[in-house]
UniProtKB/Swiss-Prot annotation:
This is Type III effector DspE. The gene is dspE. It comes from the Bacteria. Residues 91-103, 407-418 have a biased composition (Polar residues). Polyamidoamine dendrimers inhibit channel and virulence activities. Disruption phenotype: Disruption mutant cannot cause fire blight. Mutant is severely impaired in its ability to induce electrolyte leakage in apple and tobacco leaves. Transposon insertion reduces the ability of strain Ea321, but not of strain Ea273, to elicit the hypersensitive response (HR) in tobacco. Mutant induces fewer necrotic symptoms on A.thaliana leaves than wild-type strain. It is unable to multiply in A.thaliana leaves and bacterial numbers decrease rapidly after inoculation. It comes from Erwinia amylovora (Fire blight bacteria).
Length: 1838
């Protein structure tokens, strides 16, 4: 065979193929489609066949000259060499012999040059190189255009520039062609594999044989050389040279580098392809190119450029020549300002650095051929103490022992010895291991596991290649220095010597090999105490020693309940066997000899040193041997950190090195080779991109800008209509959640390398309910999280509908008819209109409209869809981004189905995968331009600027401002002939207050109709019947009616529970029930209630309790109905619970004063429906036990569906009560809010519309709707957008009394009252869509004030009075009176506000229609209210008071406009310029609110005691005023003056807000039954942390209980773990999850409520208060030292103990326009007691709320900082005594950072924390560094 390289104008290719001595393998391929190394790696590792085989080059016995012997060169595999661009010059004329040589230089010739020839060629430096290194980076060859190139040679380069550019483009195509050929070899033997048991890993990288890639050409061109690379038939000479080289290496093996000892230069990974000439014509250049690219890991082949690290005054100094990305990461970790170093030591070659800081941390920085790593010692506390005393320190390394000596003090007498970390430690970090010297494998060959496959690193290309397809695990280096791994979990292999053990029957759980090759194997048997000792790996079975491990101490056996020891990991060292049991404790014994018996007594090994440093709850998770063969234990402490702890001479393991808090960067070229086609990419918008390839889910990492694997063994990936991604895996449909938080960060000082960053990794959530794994789903079509379809293995299409907000099916799963379908189904889809499509394997498409498959109509059948005309077969049917069907044919053509026909479709070009600035971020930035303010350094306070001009507010944001004329029309005066807006609003308010809302008329009518239905029900059912539950239990409707009977039972239970909840609400409102739902024995009916209600003409006067009791007694839902007992108690207790009349008089339609009107109507509806279900059960009884046929069941089904779907589910009373409404007034308030925003958005002259269009820069409603929709869809987690509109009016006045002259200054009292109303609409991102909230607040405020002032101008002018400064220069009759007035005022304000709001969730597919209806007015308010799911109504009140003071200095000039001496009124015009200052002296507030929905309610209470100095402000103004002053007299004596002025001004003000508020929020929600998903997740967690055999057996048996219900499985788990001793935080957390589910199931069984979220929140406008107490708190603490620590005090202590946390909070505190919230929660033990007490009915909301008043019961849950910006415009019209205001605003808020704390058994100190929001994103420097690393093929372990 020959490999020929042919350069042409169009393409060139080089193909090197792998050769396997045993069988044919896949060709090793070389090349790149771009300058990115990962692309090269993807091609090199595309196939898993023979990837580990290194090149086998057949070298001739003579050199190229034919005379001298050939020398084997240790040089890099060079693409330049393959292309011949280094040796040969430009083509000679065709007549020259050199160009017509028939054979040419072979690849063997190129790589076998002698040293002399190589040195001779060194005179000709490299040509200009195309590289991906850090020095010069180019995206494509076009980047070379225009750059000067220095060419060598004596003559001038004659090649035209255009021709060179064309050749450069050819080179790019050539590289792409090479990689394509290497990624998809055409060899027929590509699939061959080794048949040997151990994987054959090539003995050398010279074992790859060259094979041809194509035909050769005999023609030559002017700009291309033809090089023929031939293969010799006889390779015996090469084999001889190869064996000689191996022999030399065995005799003199290279030694690993040691600190302090001169180290020979070793081969090192170079993460880039060897530089190549940019054109094949440039091979003769002799002048060095000015381009000097720098690789991340420097060096050329054998050279290693070490890191340059020094110290300067204790600070880390990194040389600029270091890789920039690595410098960045080191500066962000070791180079922090808080880090101070005392000593530094470097190895001779600079590959290793040791740094000792003043906290006792010793850092080891190591550069190897494949990675960088930085780690530190495990326990710095002891060293820190010595350094603190001495003040100085030193570091030295013993060259013989390799021990690190740490000295403290100037003389360094006090030394601490520490074993330095070796290659074994770093291999544990990176997973990369090297073969030792003397093995069958090449020394230093790198090997690793990836996706359970062995991968070998190509030494020249630096690319990982798969060795074979066998599954391996537990790769490690053992005490003999060899590498071992498990094959298929049953065979132990020595990878270094290619030896294997026999295949065992049981799986191998753990193994160990000592220095002499003796092997210990622990098998994964049920008892876990059986193991084998083998003299060697390949020893005969007769020589094996089988052992049974037992406790040597009988007391240990009693403690464990058996004598056998359950081993989890095993190690042998120096003749002793050491094991760690399932509790992580150590035992040891001497290794027995053959014939000593099978029972081995194991003695406990107490680890006092580990207990002292890590606590008693540490666990031994495994063992390993270090570079010196010393045994180390892998110790996991309670902070989830793993430590390598060496075994000392005292038989104790001692703290060594922290393997968790480390910085690890390793080469991953070749491991990830994902390059999906555009149609395979799922665009998730701001969340990134996803792709599914070969069953593995990948995501485009926005941090590294590359594809990364996430989930394996996946069946399908699709995007639901709701915009979320869904995954079909293991027969289950799971919604993908895109990660938005960082990984856990340890709390404390051991988090040096915690670089907060979020990767947009998709994580599967809980499986959607309904689908069974046994169905083995093959395809899915998802509408949303509550509705989806699945194609089962049997070919059935099943639809599932889940009740929103629950994990329960709303309807039983429906199997669709297959009528009309021919062929075997392959896939299913739904389009944007929810039409269903089915694709068969034969390429046919069938469809059903939405109405047919959703209604389950029996007559509905499938219709075959006519496909577009095409000669090729249909390949696939997909959905576009807009969810429209796209048919793709095998010839590549595509057609889209739209408007009922197929149309040719051209896929849009794929945009950049990297997510740029989102639409929401763009809008936020624009809003930031319109606000002015700054954080006062060191204070945490933001000073804000506001300004207004002539009554127009929002003048400070001139960059984002609407036109003046538009603002006048929107806020002040609309010049039309229609009725003025204020008059219309007042008229509408009066009308709606009287007769309600026209859109709610169906509800009003239904309320009246239900009263009549209840009366009719009591007439029909006047005699008691058997309870409904018993009736249904006795029915037998046969096979056809089984499903109907189950539906009736489920509906009965739903009705009874709904009625019970309603009667509980009514009882609590009346006071006959307590807040916990129990009977209130102290209840006494109000004696005057009946009299008061008699005046209400809307009330019927009938006793609703008696009517309901009669109805329930006649048609009871169950034998022991709680509903019936409570109604009976209502009657006996004398509860007078009347209801409205059936016909409301005077056109009012409803009783607006009934606070529970809707709840009463819901109770009546439930009661009447129970009676009707009774009647249906009686009808079913007629055919029961008679095997009813299908027609009879069909009739019953129709009647049942009519009752449930039309008369109950579609009832407006049910709709609105499910939203949480209890009375009409709250519903009408929210209706008003919705209607207000429909009017606001559809009218372009409205203030809300104007402000929104201004911010979004849109014109007209259509563009507004489009931009608003796109912006809302781009909202990220923690972001929200709000719109508000407010208006108000008030009356205010002052009185200037005439005082005695003895009073030096005037005293001016004043008062005012203001009415205001505000409407709010907000959108916020939530899981699964957007939260939408409409709200209306209305309030009244009153204020009183006292002011004074004095004119100081007379003192300046020498006049006696102010009148003396008057001037008549303008007019003698109208004098101008100047004055300079100093004034001050004190005011008090009291404000009350009523709050109403409605919140619900919209999925992304519902948003466009919602926005269109809102902005165009095509939807009514009632229709908008019905949109979405999970509605929650909120109603509350707020009362605030404040005392403020102000001072001002005004220079004024006034002119008297009336005649002198005119009485009693004087008219004055005045202009002034002034300065003002204000301060809030005291403020307090009280707030209450209740949020109710279908599944629970939340109460919030806020009692904020008076706080002082909550805000200050300063301003300046220019004012023009006009007014009248009325002089009042009494009996001829002046009493005072009533002034009334109107003014216009230009003003600006600075203000800061220092207020703090607190609130308690408690949620009680309906408990849901535990599901199989809950059990599956729980058992997985328990099995991970409890590894004893009893638990393992129990969990395995639990999985086999197919028929067991989740509640039964939960009971088994509870019984098993109730007796378990919980030691360690992970076990504590697992058992805590079990207890939560137990309480939840108990609450569900008893139909009780469970405690949901419960928190105490403190909100700060002054961010410095997060960790610093205010004056009031300090005073309280001073007078009462026993007070518990406040949240600020606790956070301050956390920050002092954790520098990383301190840096994060300090960064958050520097954010302008932000506020902070600190949330506290109940400690676990107290919460568990509270949950049980609620379940037992012992406590209610009030009792739970009391627990939050004692902060000893609480722990810090989270700290959150949010930033908000707003654009507000409006107009204020102060006119004499009456003033009005009108404004609109658009605002956005985003989560700057949230710190969530996680606790273990210690409830006072958090174990770890996670970050969310902006602070969680990697800072730009780190992000850039990680991206650069990825480009070099390196990745940081996170």
């Amino acid at each position: 065979m020959e490999l020929k390289s042919l350069g042409t104008e169009h393409k060139a290719a080089v193909h090197t193929a792998a050769h396997n001595p045993v069988g044919h393998g896949v060709a090793l391929q070389q090349g790149s489609s771009s300058s990115s190394p990962q692309n090269a790696a993807a091609s090199l590792a595309a196939e898993g066949k023979n990837r580990g085989k290194m090149p086998r080059i057949h070298q001739p016995s003579t050199a190229a000259d034919g005379i001298s012997a050939a020398h084997q060169q240790k040089k890099s595999f060079s693409l330049r060499g393959c292309l011949g661009t280094k040796k040969f010059s430009r083509s000679a004329p065709q007549g020259q012999p050199g160009t017509t040589h028939s054979k040419g230089a072979t690849l063997r010739d190129l790589l076998a040059r002698d040293d002399g020839e190589t040195q001779h060629e060194a005179a000709a430096p490299d040509a200009a190189r195309l590289t991906r290194s850090g020095g010069v980076k180019r995206r494509n060859m076009d980047d070379m255009a225009g750059r000067p190139m220095v060419k060598g040679g004596s003559g001038e380069d004659k090649v035209p520039t255009q021709q060179k550019r064309h050749q450069l483009n050819n080179f790019g195509q050539m590289r792409q062609t090479m990689l394509s050929k290497m990624a998809h070899p055409a060899s027929a033997n590509a699939g061959d594999r080794l048949q040997h048991s151990p994987p054959h890993i090539p003995g050398s990288h010279h074992e790859i044989k060259e094979e041809p890639v194509g035909s050769t050409s005999k023609a030559t061109t002017a700009h291309a050389d033809r090089v023929e690379i031939a293969q010799e038939d006889d390779d015996s000479e090469f084999q001889q040279l190869h064996q000689q080289r191996l022999a030399r290496e065995r005799e003199n093996p290279p030694q690993p580098p040691k600190l302090g000892v001169a180290t020979p230069i070793s081969a090192r990974f170079q993460p880039k392809l060897t530089a190549v000439a940019e054109s094949v014509l440039e091979g003769t250049d002799t002048t060095q190119s000015p381009l000097k690219p720098q690789s991340m890991l420097k060096g050329s082949g054998a050279g290693v450029t070490p890191l340059a690290v020094t110290l300067d005054k204790g600070k880390l100094q990194l040389a600029p020549d270091n890789p920039p990305a690595l410098n960045t990461l080191l500066k962000q970790t070791l180079g922090k300002d808080t880090q101070h170093y005392l000593a530094h030591h470097a190895s001779s070659d600079g590959s290793q650095h040791l740094l000792l800081d003043n906290k006792g941390h010793l850092f080891d920085i190591k550069s190897t051929a494949t990675s960088y790593s930085v780690l530190h010692n495990s326990h710095p506390g002891e060293i820190k103490g010595k350094l603190a005393q001495a003040g100085t320190g030193s570091v030295s390394v013993d060259g013989k022992s390799g021990k690190i000596s740490l000295g403290s003090g100037t003389q360094s007498h006090n030394k601490t010895m520490l074993s330095q970390p070796g290659e074994a430690h770093r291999s544990l970090l990176t997973g990369i291991w090297q073969h030792p010297a003397g093995a069958a494998r090449p020394q230093g060959e790198s090997i690793r596991l990836h996706d359970d496959k062995i991968h070998i690193l190509h030494p020249e290309l630096g690319v990982w290649q798969s060795a074979d397809k066998d599954t391996h695990s537990q790769l490690s280096r053992q005490a003999d220095g060899k590498l071992y791994a498990l094959k298929d979990n049953r065979t132990l292999q020595n990878l270094s010597d290619n030896k294997s053990s026999e295949k065992l029957v049981d799986k191998i759980k753990s193994y160990s090999v000592d220095q002499r090759g003796q092997v210990a194997i622990l098998t994964d048997t049920p008892g876990r105490h059986k193991m084998s000792i083998m003299p060697s790996l390949d020893a005969s079975p007769e020589s094996h020693i089988s052992l049974s491990l037992h406790f040597a101490d009988a007391h240990q056996g009693l403690l464990h309940g058996k004598s056998e020891l359950e081993a989890q990991s095993v190690a042998i060292s120096h003749g002793r066997l050491v094991v760690a049991d399932s509790e992580g404790k150590l035992f040891s014994a001497a290794i027995p000899k053959q014939g000593d018996g099978n029972e081995l007594k194991m003695k406990a090994m107490p680890q006092h040193a580990l207990d002292e440093h890590f606590g008693h709850d540490h666990q031994i998770s495994g063992f390993f041997h270090d570079d010196h063969g010393q045994l180390n234990a892998l110790v996991k402490n309670n902070f989830r950190q793993q430590h390598a702890c060496p075994l000392g001479n005292d038989h104790q393991f001692h703290p060594g090195w922290n393997l968790t808090d480390a910085l690890v960067i390793d080469n991953q070229l070749g491991l990830h080779h994902t390059n999906p086609e555009p149609h395979e990419i799922l665009d998730m918008g701001h969340l990134g991109s996803l792709a599914l390839q070969e069953g593995k889910l990948h995501y485009f990492d926005q941090l590294t800008k590359g594809w990364t694997g996430a989930e394996s063994d996946c069946k399908q990936l699709k995007k639901g209509l709701d915009g979320a991604a869904y995954l079909l895996k293991d027969g289950e449909v799971k919604r993908l959640n895109i990660n938005q938080s960082t990984s856990s960060i340890k709390h404390g000082t051991e988090n040096v390398f915690s670089l907060p960053h979020v990767r947009n990794k998709p994580e599967p959530g809980d499986a959607l309910q309904g689908l069974n794994k046994d169905d083995k789903a093959q395809a899915m079509a998802v509408i949303g999280v509550n509705k989806y379809l699945a194609l089962t293995e049997k070919g059935d299409i099943r639809s599932f509908q889940i009740k929103p907000g629950t994990q329960q099916l709303e309807r039983p799963a429906q199997t669709l008819s297959r009528e009309g379908i021919s062929g075997e189904l392959k896939d299913i889809h739904v389009d944007h209109k929810q039409n269903l499509y089915a694709l068969t394997h034969e390429g046919e498409v069938f469809h059903q409209p939405r109405e047919a498959w959703q209604n389950g109509a029996e007559s509905s059948s499938w219709h075959k869809l006519a496909l577009p005309q095409s000669e090729s077969k249909l390949k696939s049917l997909d959905m576009s981004h807009e969810h429209k069907p796209i048919a793709t044919f095998e010839d590549g053509s595509q057609h889209q189905l739209k408007a009922g026909g197929w149309h040719a479709y051209a896929a849009p070009e794929r945009g950049p995968l990297a997510v740029g600035t989102s639409g929401s971020q763009t809008v936020f930035n624009r809003l930031m331009q319109g606000v002015k303010g700054k954080v006062i350094p060191g204070s945490g306070l933001t000073v804000k600027l506001s300004a207004q001009t002539g009554g127009m507010t929002g003048a400070e944001g001139r960059k984002v401002s609407s036109k003046f004329s538009e603002r006048i029309r929107a806020y002040a005066f609309n010049p039309t002939m229609s009725t003025p807006r204020p008059i219309k609003n007042a008229a509408y308010a009066t009308q709606h207050g009287w007769q309600g809302r026209e859109g709610l008329k169906p509800l009003y009518e239904m309320q009246g109709a239900l009263i009549k239905q209840l009366d009719a029900h009591n007439v029909r059912h006047n005699a008691p019947q058997p309870d409904l539950q018993s009736k249904l239990e006795t029915l037998d409707l046969g096979e056809h009616g089984a499903e109907l009977l189950n539906d009736m039972k489920r509906f009965r239970d739903e009705l009874e529970q709904s009625a019970t909840r309603s009667v509980t609400v009514l009882g609590q409102h009346q006071g006959v029930l307590k807040s916990n739902g129990e009977i209130n024995s102290e209840f006494k009916p109000s004696p005057g209630k009946a009299l008061v209600q008699s005046f209400n003409v809307n009330r019927s006067g009938q006793d609703l309790s008696k009517s309901l009791q009669q109805a329930v007694h006649a048609t009871p839902p169950s034998a022991e109905s709680k509903l019936q007992s409570m109604l009976g108690h209502f009657v006996s207790a004398g509860v007078d619970m009347s209801h409205q009349k059936g016909e409301i008089p005077l056109g009012r339609q409803r009783d607006p004063n009934d606070k529970t009107a809707l709840t009463k109507s819901r109770l009546i509806l439930d009661t009447v429906t129970i009676g009707e279900l009774h009647e249906l059960a009686d009808k079913a009884k007629l055919v029961s036990d008679h095997k009813p046929d299908a027609d009879q069941i069909k009739q019953l089904r129709q009647q049942f569906d009519t009752l449930r779907e039309k008369r109950y589910e579609s009832n407006p009373v049910k709709h609105y009560t499910d939203m949480g409404f209890t009375h009409n007034k709250a519903l009408e308030a929210n209706y008003d809010a919705v209607k207000a925003f429909i009017n606001a958005f559809k009218k372009e002259h409205h203030g809300v519309n104007l402000t929104t269009r201004t911010v979004l820069e849109s014109q007209g409603s259509a563009e507004l709707a489009k931009k608003l929709k796109n912006t809302l869809l781009s909202l990220d987690s923690g972001e929200s957008m709000s719109f508000s509109r407010s208006y108000g009016g008030g009356v205010s006045t002052v009185f200037v009394p005439t005082l005695s002259k003895k009073v030096p200054v005037p005293v001016i009292p004043g008062a005012g009252i203001t009415l205001d109303r505000a409407y709010n609409l907000s959108f916020s991102r939530t899981s699964g869509g957007l939260n939408v909230s409409f709200g209306r607040d209305g309030g009244v405020s009153g204020n009183i004030m006292v002011a004074t002032g004095h004119d100081v101008m007379p003192y300046m002018t020498g006049k006696k009075t102010s009148a003396g400064n008057a001037s008549d220069w303008l007019s003698a009759k109208h004098k101008i009176s100047p004055d300079l007035r100093i004034g001050a005022a004190v005011s008090g304000t009291l404000q009350g506000t009523l709050q109403n709001s409605l919140k619900f969730k919209l999925t992304e597919d519902e948003l466009p229609g919602f926005i269109h209806g809102l902005t165009h007015g095509t939807l009514t308010p009632a229709e908008l209210l019905q949109k979405g799911i999970e509605h929650q109504m909120k109603q509350g009140s707020k009362l605030t008071f404040s005392v403020d003071t102000s001072a001002n200095l005004d220079l004024r000039a006034g002119i008297n406009l009336n005649e002198d001496g005119s009485k009693p009124n004087g008219v004055t015009a005045r202009v002034s310029a002034g300065l003002s200052a204000s301060a809030n002296l005291a403020a307090g507030s009280r707030e209450r609110s209740t949020t109710s929905g279908q599944f629970g309610s939340t109460t919030s209470a806020s009692n904020n005691r008076p706080t002082f100095l909550n805000g200050v402000g300063a301003g300046a103004n220019l004012t023009a005023a006009l007014g009248v002053a009325h002089s009042s007299t009494h009996e001829g004596k002046p009493v005072g003056i009533f002034p009334a002025f109107t003014s216009t001004n230009v003003s600006a003000a600075l203000a800061l807000d220092n207020r703090t508020s607190q609130s308690i929020s408690l949620e009680l929600k309906r408990a849901e039954p535990v599901t199989s998903n809950d059990i599956s997740e729980l058992t997985s967690t328990l099995g991970k942390h409890f590894k004893d055999s009893a638990t393992t057996k129990m969990l395995a048996a639990l999985k086999e209980l197919d028929d067991a219900k989740p509640a039964e499985q939960l009971h088994i788990l509870q019984q098993h773990f109730s007796a378990k001793d919980v030691v360690g935080d992970e076990r504590y957390e697992a058992v805590r999850n079990l207890k939560k589910l137990v309480i939840r199931q108990q609450a569900a069984d008893s139909h009780s409520m469970e405690l949901g979220s419960a928190s105490h929140s403190t909100t700060y406008n002054n961010l410095s208060r997060i960790n610093n107490d205010g004056i009031v708190e300090l005073l309280h603490k001073h007078f009462d030292a026993a007070l518990p620590a406040s949240s600020a005090k606790r956070l301050g202590e956390m920050m002092n103990n954790d520098p990383a946390l301190k840096d994060i909070i300090k960064q958050l505190q520097s954010t302008p326009f932000s506020s902070a919230s600190v949330s506290m929660e109940l400690k676990d033990g107290l919460r568990e007691q509270t949950e049980k007490a609620i379940l037992d009915g012992k406590v209610g909301r009030e009792e739970v709320g009391v627990l939050f008043q004692d902060r000893n019961n609480l722990r810090v849950k989270s700290v959150s900082v949010s930033q908000s910006v707003s654009k507000s415009e409006g107009f204020n019209t102060p006119a004499l005594l009456l003033g009005t205001s009108n404004s609109a605003a658009m605002s956005m808020e985003r989560n700057i950072g949230t710190i969530n704390f996680k606790y273990g058994q210690d409830q006072n100190t958090p174990r770890r924390f996670t970050l969310e929001g902006g602070i969680a994103q990697a800072n730009p420097q780190v992000a850039s560094a990680l991206t650069d690393l990825k480009k070099e093929g390196l990745e940081m372990k996170s």
